From Swiss-Prot:
InterPro entries: Ribosomal_eL37 (IPR001569), Ribosomal_eL37/eL43 (IPR011331), Ribosomal_eL37_CS (IPR018267), Ribosomal_zn-bd (IPR011332). Belongs to the eukaryotic ribosomal protein eL37 family. This is Large ribosomal subunit protein eL37y. PROSITE patterns: RIBOSOMAL_L37E. GO terms for cellular component: cytosolic ribosome; nucleus; ribonucleoprotein complex. It comes from Arabidopsis thaliana.
Length: 95
């Protein structure tokens, strides 16, 4: 029996599946534990020995659908449901 190239063809079962917390394919099915974020533990798994890896998955590297708009909404005090007042037509034409 060989333990090298020939044996790799036998590997057909997935040991990891998608994690519901971090979304990565790091959730170990038999252990029921995510290797990336340590789900279902309450504290998220982060180590400082891999600074570059933290930089890859930190806030701002994804879509940020909500957080992207927060600074703009903060300027107006998070007001919603109001309409802009109509501008004076005379001021716009003379300027």
């Amino acid at each position: 029996m060989t333990k090298g190239t020939g044996s790799f063809g036998k590997r057909r079962n997935k040991s990891h599946t998608l994690c519901v917390r971090c979304g990565r394919r790091s959730f170990h099915i038999q252990k029921s534990r995510c290797s990336a974020c340590a789900y279902p533990a309450a504290r998220k798994r982060t180590y400082n020995w891999s600074v570059k890896a933290i930089r890859r998955k930190t806030t701002g590297t994804g879509r940020m659908r909500y957080l992207r708009n927060v600074p703009r909404r903060f300027k107006t005090g998070f007001r919603e449901g109001t309409e802009a007042k109509p501008r004076n037509k005379g001021v716009a034409s003379s300027a």
